[in-house]
Amino acid sequence: MATLHIEHPITDLSTWLGAFSRFSEARKSAGVNAERIQQPIDDPNYIVVQLDFDEAAAATAFKQFLETNVWSSPQASPGLAGSPRARVLESVTAR
């Protein structure tokens, strides 16, 4: 399993959630099988998203889609304030 971990400042939660919802089909088509949205308890203008994929390649491809088609356009990413930080993570096992 791989997780696309994304975090960034937002203008407000309602606007951001509306934009996030518009891309639900894109997430499904890309192979997202679970998602988590969280905020720091002390910062309502910051969001953390984790999207789970079966394969790292699918997570990497979706990261590239977001960078090229979503985050590069203010019209496609209302609610985004600042630059997102995104990384593809894989689970490790303690020995």
Q: Predicted segment positions?
A:
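Short structural boundary motif marking the start of a folded domain
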Residues: 1-4
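Short hydrophobic/aromatic beta-strand micro-patches
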Residues: 7-9, 50-52
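Short, surface-exposed ligand-recognition loops at beta-strand->loop->(often short) alpha-helix junctions
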Residues: 9-19
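Residues that cap or initiate secondary-structure elements
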Residues: 12-14, 55-57, 92
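An amphipathic, aromatic/His-enriched active-site/gating alpha helix that lines ligand/cofactor pockets
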Residues: 17-36, 52-86
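Residues that line or immediately flank small-molecule/substrate-binding pockets and catalytic motifs
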Residues: 39
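Short acidic/glycine-enriched loop/turn segments that link adjacent beta-strands
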Residues: 42-45
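Short, low-order "capping/linker" segments at domain edges
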Residues: 87-95
